[in-house]
Amino acid sequence: MKISVIMPMYNATKTVLYSVDSIVAQTYTDFEVLIVDDCSTDESVKICEEHYKDEPRVKVIRQEKNAGPAAARNRGMELAQGEYITFLDSDDGMLPDTLEKFADAAKKTDADVVHTVGKLIPGVNPTPDDIMSVPREKLMNNVADTDAPDTMTILPDDIGARIDGFLAGKYKGNVWGKMFKTNFLRDNALTFAHLKMSEDTIFSLECLLRAGTYVQIPESLIIYRMVGDSLSRGKKTPAFFAKILDATLGGNVVLQEKLSAIPYVKEHPENIKTILVRVAEAMEGVYIRPAYRIVGREAIESDDGINEVWSRYFGGNAFLMKKTFYDAHDSYPPVPDYFSEVEFGEMFEDKLKSQNKQEG
């Protein structure tokens, strides 16, 4: 059973070899790695082609134009030859037995989706380029799914129960740490929406609500870089705020369209609003409120790019929507920017100490 590992790449010279090497070093050997380059302007393509010239399982694919990680993942999905597909970012890593555990679960259950419940976060600051060099005792096991199972668990077929689980935080929206049956994706025409953010949440949710056999395994297998230069962890500027606002509003439109096409949701349309609110709240708490706090209302109100986003989605009602939004955010208590390096260290130091004490 071949597994296709798809890795979107853009200007990742510092980290990509370490990420790909973590795949090449897997105990499960029947895989291919599709590195899909999104028109990098650095030496990423060159170093990958040179480093893996004698490794036939690793292929570098060049996009014709820069179109973002969603388009890169979609291209990889089109070209994938494996029976299953999984994803890894070009600055993350995977434990050596990751694909073996994925394959074992898939073979036992014939799953459409295999879903791990957490991630491993390096408890060092700064995180080294070679994320695989972080000692095991410095990796914090972050079980993101609430009420995560202790053993391999097949979700009920009841889609309403799956929606309830999603709303309760049981199934997170990341695509790394999950593996998808290729025919399931193709038969349901499941692809990533062309959004700057939240496209992974929309994709994962659509898979959750369309899958036949959906399996959770109680593992944290992906080593995830919390602090980096990706869009979701970018510098808090008016331009960044415009991007996350556009992603949130645009994602809301796309998600509503995709939910409306799911048979169960068609029969129970009351779920649409509840899901939209849940996803918007997640974007709000993690991205929008921290950025609003740092950028400030004055800079946000006067920015042409941000005003254009409001006008594009709300037309003549943009002024009222902006005022309501800004007034509400002025009244909210401050929330931490979880992706700043200083707060990152403070946030995880005690948790890492507690974890190591329990394991010891």
Task: Identify what each model region corresponds to.
Residues 69, 90-216, 222-241:
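Donor-binding/catalytic cores of nucleotide-activated saccharide
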Residues 22, 37-47, 65:
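A conserved acidic beta->alpha catalytic loop
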Residues 2-4, 22, 32, 202:
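Cell-envelope/extracellular polymer assembly enzymes that use nucleotide-activated donors
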Residues 132, 289-360:
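Membrane-interface aromatic/basic loop that binds lipid-linked glycans or pyrophosphate carriers
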Residues 85:
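Short aromatic/hydrophobic "clamp" motif used to bind/position activated sugar donors
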Residues 11-25:
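Short, well-formed alpha-helical segments that are part of the catalytic scaffolds
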Residues 63-80, 93, 101:
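Glycine-rich, basic loop-to-helix element that forms the pyrophosphate-binding segment
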Residues 219-228, 234-264, 285, 289-317:
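Catalytic core of nucleotide-sugar-dependent glycosyltransferases
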